[in-house]
Regions:
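Active-site Tyr-X3-Lys motif and surrounding loop/helix of classical short-chain dehydrogenase/reductase
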Residues: 67, 89, 93-102
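Rossmann-fold cofactor-recognition segment
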Residues: 45-60
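C-terminal helical subdomain
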Residues: 177, 193-244
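Catalytic loop of short-chain dehydrogenase/reductase
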Residues: 83-89, 98, 120-172, 179-192
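Conserved N-terminal Rossmann-fold NAD(P)-binding element of oxidoreductases
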Residues: 4-9, 31
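Conserved glycine-rich Rossmann-like NAD(P)H-binding loop of the short-chain dehydrogenase/reductase
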Residues: 24-39
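N-terminal Rossmann NAD(P)H-binding glycine-rich loop of SDR-like oxidoreductase domains
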Residues: 10-12, 16-18
């Protein structure tokens, strides 16, 4: 039996992963953005190992989330599932960051740095990361004209690079990125063509399976098959530049 923390587990793929893991007998620590969203998890929460509440767009609340998770105890796996898509405006988090960058990239970066090293790390990427450029100028969209699709693609490229950088820097902690496909969740929309019932299975497999493939590190996965991510994400120099930029924006180093 494993203990797993899943961000964004109030709905969509995070909720599906939580249900599957709890059904299989694992201890799952749930996460919801607000008390209102947490209240919808009453039935599942009663069978979970706890529920942590906090907005991943706020660095203060991210730190609180990390503290609560650490108080529960060391995790066997952390699934960085939470994300936002097609945000119509840049937004402005309490720290002044673009909302998409804050939730999709800065939050998992900070949680990776602040939560005690788990036995496994899983980061939910997207095939759209391949459409992002590899420039790290103005990643927070301070000067550029806002483009929701580009911002999302870039945030997932940085996240993929983060996953592979952690795999390289922390060899004792298997770290992998997952493309769940375009699935009909609240974020993906009702017209998404992929199968919702399959979208969470790779990350749950990576979190708990003793299969030799699931114990490997530095992979980019889609439906339990390793694929090639964008070339930039594989390059150690780019990975290190991403970590440096994220460290600069958050004041926290990995």
């Amino acid at each position: 039996m494993s203990r797993i923390f899943i961000t964004g587990s109030a709905d969509g793929l995070g909720l599906a992963a939580a249900r599957t893991l709890i059904h299989d007998g694992h201890q799952v620590v749930l996460h919801a953005r607000s008390g209102k969203r947490a209240s919808a998890l009453d039935e599942l929460a009663s069978r979970s190992a706890g529920i942590v509440i906090g907005d991943l767009a706020s660095e203060r609340e991210i730190r609180s989330i990390a503290e609560e998770v650490n108080m529960i105890g060391r995790m066997d796996a952390v699934i960085h599932n939470a994300g936002v898509y097609q945000v119509p405006e840049r937004g402005n988090t309490p720290e002044g960051h673009a909302t998409v960058l804050a939730v999709n990239t800065l939050a998992p970066y900070l949680l990776t740095a602040l939560i005690e090293h788990p036995k496994r790390l899983i980061y939910l990427s997207s095939g759209m990361h391949r459409g992002a450029g590899d420039s790290l100028q103005d990643i927070d969209w301070v000067q550029r004209r806002w483009n929701p699709t580009t911002a999302y693609s870039e945030s997932k490229l940085y996240l993929t690079a983060l996953a592979l950088a952690v795999a390289r820097r922390w060899p004792a902690v298997p770290s992998n990125a997952v493309d769940p496909g375009w699935v009909p969740t609240r974020m993906g929309g009702p017209g998404a063509p992929d199968d919702l019932t399959l979208g969470h299975l790779t990350q749950t497999w990576l979190a708990v399976s003793e299969d030799a493939q699931a114990l490997t590190s530095g992979g980019y996965w889609h439906h339990r098959k390793r694929q090639s991510p964008a070339r930039a994400a594989l390059e150690p120099d780019f990975q290190d530049q991403v970590l440096a930029k994220l460290g600069e924006l958050t004041g926290v180093s990995i």
